[in-house]
Every structure is written in C-alpha cells, then in structure tokens.
Amino acid sequence: MASLFERPSLVFGAAIVLRAILLVYGAWQDAHSAVKYTDIDYMVFTDAARYVSKGDSPYARDTYRYTPLLAWLLLPTSWDGFFSFGKVLFALSDVVAGWLIAKALTSFYGMSPPRALKYASVWLLNPMVANISTRGSSEGLLCVLVIALLWAVLNRKITLAGVLLGLSVHFKIYPFVYGPSIIWWLDEEREGLKSSSQKQKPEQDDRNLLTHIFNFITPSRLLLTTTALATFSGLNISMYILYDFPFAQHTYLHHLTRIDHRHNFSPYSSLLYLSAAGDIQGSFESLAFIPQLLLSVVVIPIVLAKRSLPGAMLAQTFAFVTFNKVCTSQYFLWYLIFLPFYLPSSSLMKNPRLGITVTALWVIAQALWLQQGYYLEFLGLSSFVPGLFLASLGFFAVNIWILGIIINDVALEGC
C-alpha cells in the first residue's frame, strides 16, 4: 500500500478510473432503470444551458437557482452527443481538487509527497465524492475553488485569494463564512509587521483601543477584503445587467426563504413540509439562520482560526451544513474536502476506535434517514412524522457530537 502512494500516477489514475466506471454505469442505469442515476439538478443545469444556447436566459428554466456562469460552462451539453460533458467536467474537478490538496499538504504542512497523497486519497478515492460528481452535481467545481482559496491564503498569495473568495461566493453563497476566519488568521505576526517597540508595550496597547483597531487593519487584510468585494460585486453587476432581477431573485434572494422538504436531512424538514402545505405560520425559515451564522461566522472563526485555518474552515462548514435548514448529500462534500488537513493530527486517527465509531454512526444515521425516505418516495407511505422527523433528529445529534470532536481537536491540537 505504501508503494501506491509513492506513485502519484497510480493514485490519480485510480481516481479517474473510478469516476469513469461510475459514468458508464450511470448511463446504463439511466437507460434501463426507473430509478435514474443522474441527479435531477443536472437536468436543470443542462436545460438552462440549452436556453442560453438559444439566446435566452437560464432562468427561463424553472428551479434554476444558480449563477449564469454554471449554465455558460455547460453550453457544450446542448450539442449532440455531449449531454454528459458536465458530469465529466465535475468529475475531473474532483481530481483537480485532490491534486490541490496534496500540493497544499506538501507546501505548507511540510508532508512528504507520499504521506500527502495518502491523505489526499481520502478525497480522491472516496466513493461518495465520485458518486455525487458523476451523478451531475456541480459541487466538484466549488470544491476546486475553495481548496484553491485555502492554498492561496496559506501561500500568501493574497490577491489571488481575494479573487477566489469573491468568485466562490458568487458561485454559491456559503463560502462567505470563510472570510472572517481568513481575515482573523492574517494577523501581524504572520505578516512580520509588528515592530519590536509594539511588542514591548502590551500594557499601553491594551489601554488604547484605537491602536488595536489600526493594528488590525493590515495591508493583507485590506487587500483580501477589497479584492474579494471587487470580484464579487463585478460579477454580480455584470450578471444583473445581463439578466436583470431574475438573477438576483433566483441566485440569492430565493435562498433566504427557501422551503425544500424533499431529500432534506435537516430536522427542519418536517417544519418545511408543514409550512409548504400551509399548516403552520411563521418566519422560522429566516430565524433558522441565527444559530447557523452565529456559530459559523462568529464563534468558530474567533476561537479556532488562529489555531488552524483549515481546521477552522472544516468546523465552520460542518456547523453551517449541520444547522442549515436544507441539508442534502451534496452538501457533505463541502466539509469532506477539508478532511485531509484535519485527519493527520486528529483524535480520530490517534484513537482508531473513536474514528471507527464516528464513521459508523455517521453512516448508520444517514441509512436510517434514507430508509424513511424510501418509504416516502418509492412506496408512497407518509413517513414525515414520526419516521423522517426522528431520523433527522438522530442524524442532527450525531453531527453535533462530531462537530464537538472537531472543535476540541482544532482548539487543543491545531488540527
């Protein structure tokens, strides 16, 4: 096994072959089974691309809730014989993300290439990751942007990091949570800007709030913030000019009051179902953001970012997904991408029994939910209450426990 990781061509070749097999199998299942392999979102993407190819708006396709950039990227799917172009693009994006992970582990963490590749394989050879991308989920593209962002920050390429952060948030809203962690991580000591005179007078600095404020505003923080805002604003203004209010409505505003109770692991799913049916009244869809954002945008960055930026980003993402009012399997990729950075020093590796228990409970909790989902989707049985609701609570409880382990590891070990 050790020799495998000493030969990158074998690992990346295996990752590509795994995805190629799933692509071929997916085409066969789509043609021969009532249960389709291709994700319904991919049909939405390709329909939107077809509208764009005809000179129309991608938002002419109902339920297209994404940036027009995605429809533009998938324009080849409107050509004869190129329907699976997007799936191939997403699958290759997975592999590129894995390459960036290995590169970051060697350049910043000083790992040997074989050891870095071993941990990168947690992503590259993960069947869940390969399955989701080959079904037509675009998360692989986003994961490339996020890991490229992390690599750029760790290697002090601040302008590039700002561009990638702005592009990532434009592509999908949630990466904005990384902004506070990155800014907090970029302190004076890392930039080498704090003078010896400043270091010799901590008591004086503590009494001077204005000094702290000025010390916080460093060149790197300013550059990152302005570059990210300029990129995000430039893209949004351009898209608004092209597609007017439907762009803002479907890409951003829709998600503030989104009601989606199908394929939703969140404990909010039953409430969303009742809300969609008109059985309950209230604004809980918006209130659900409070614990989610408090944890992922405020508490975790302040507590963890200076200990470990990748660890803080993992904890932020895990908290964001766990507390999100909509939680689907695709969202798991958002935090799985950070596992190669967290695992080497984690308690899950130091205590294999704990690692196996965490993995088993995470999988079992999903399986119990999927069983109830099968009763609902395929057998037509009403399983929202108590089946799906209890399964969602169980999965939520498991994730809260895992989040506690991650936060503790990062705080104590700097994972």
Curated annotation (Swiss-Prot):
Enzyme Commission code: 2.4.1.-
Gene Ontology terms describing biological process: cell wall organization; GPI anchor biosynthetic process
Pathway(s) it belongs to: Glycolipid biosynthesis; glycosylphosphatidylinositol-anchor biosynthesis
Membrane spanning stretches: 8-28, 82-102, 134-154, 158-178, 222-242, 284-304, 329-349, 354-374, 387-407
UniProt xrefs under Pfam families: Mannosyl_trans (PF05007)
Cell location: Endoplasmic reticulum membrane
Keywords per UniProt: Cell wall biogenesis/degradation, Endoplasmic reticulum, Glycosyltransferase, GPI-anchor biosynthesis, Membrane, Transferase, Transmembrane, Transmembrane helix
Role: Mannosyltransferase involved in glycosylphosphatidylinositol-anchor biosynthesis. Transfers the first alpha-1,4-mannose to GlcN-acyl-PI during GPI precursor assembly. Required for cell wall integrity.
Record protein name field: GPI mannosyltransferase 1
Organism: Aspergillus oryzae (strain ATCC 42149 / RIB 40) (Yellow koji mold)
Gene that produces this protein: gpi14
